[in-house]
Design a protein with these regions (language model features):
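Amphipathic alpha-helical segments
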Residues: 1-19
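Intrinsically disordered, low-complexity regions enriched in serine/threonine
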Residues: 27, 38-241
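Short, well-structured alpha-helical interface segments that form or flank functional binding sites
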Residues: 3-7, 27-29, 50
Length: 241
């Protein structure tokens, strides 16, 4: 199926440029990341957002064969959210014919090329909402990483089971706050970037950073990191209304 994916991309080379191909778990799955040509918009001068199309394939049924559209901030390569509206979904079961499925791709690419401006306008709306202190940042952070606070853990001091608290994700919260103050953009857009930077570049507690990076990459495209960024984006957008 990888060769077919590359054939499909070649057929659409006027619109797509392959950026990288990543194989994981000894070839059990692959992600083929493509830039969508001439598909860049600016939130403000020098702050560009680019849209990517990622083909996901697996040979162990971990993933359906599908295409994911993701917005990226070029300034820092933050993942800024997956485009999950119904018109942006293109998924197939492995039992179906990929060649037949791919006939829908040109129309799908056209939809998403035209749709980028909607994302840009959303980010601009976030940038107009100024924040004071870190109360709103903290609320968005807790809302976005709520999955990390589910369940119980054994307290290191008392050795008894207890519910998780924000103290158990203090590393993540410290990273988000540091990102927020470093960027010096005290707006909803700045809050979103603080969280997306942490999830894109810092998330993970494995000492081996190479493993961390691979785990993050998978998680950003089709896992918890991507989910948290999507939740943060939706929450920030809701606060602009």
């Amino acid at each position: 199926n990888n060769s077919r994916t590359l054939d499909i991309i070649e057929q659409n080379k006027d619109f797509l440029d392959i950026e990288n191909v990543i194989n994981g778990q000894g070839g059990a799955f692959s992600f083929v990341s493509c830039a969508m040509k001439d598909n860049i918009g600016e939130v403000s001068q020098g702050d560009a957002i680019k849209r990517r199309m990622i083909f996901i394939n697996s040979f162990n049924n971990a993933y359906s064969y599908k295409v994911v559209i993701i917005d990226f901030r070029l300034f820092c390569f933050n993942q800024m959210g997956r485009i999950n509206k119904s018109k942006n979904k293109l998924t197939m079961k492995h039992s179906k014919n990929i060649t037949s499925w791919s006939k829908h791709l040109p129309e799908y690419i056209a939809q998403n090329r035209d749709d980028l401006q909607e994302s840009i306008e959303q980010f601009r709306a976030m940038k107009k909402v100024e924040l004071k202190g870190t109360e709103t940042l903290r609320e968005i952070f807790l809302h976005s990483l709520a999955d990390k606070l589910k369940g119980q853990i054994t307290d290191k001091r008392t050795k008894e089971k207890r519910n998780k608290t924000i103290n158990d994700i203090d590393k993540e919260w410290s990273e988000v706050k540091n990102n927020y103050y470093r960027d010096n953009d005290f707006s909803l857009y700045g809050a979103l970037n603080a969280i997306t930077y942490q999830q894109t570049h810092s998330e993970g507690r494995i000492l081996d950073e190479n493993k961390n990076a691979m785990n993050r990459y998978q998680s950003l495209i089709a896992g918890p990191c991507g989910n948290r960024i999507d939740i943060a984006r939706e929450r920030c957008l809701a606060l602009t209304r």
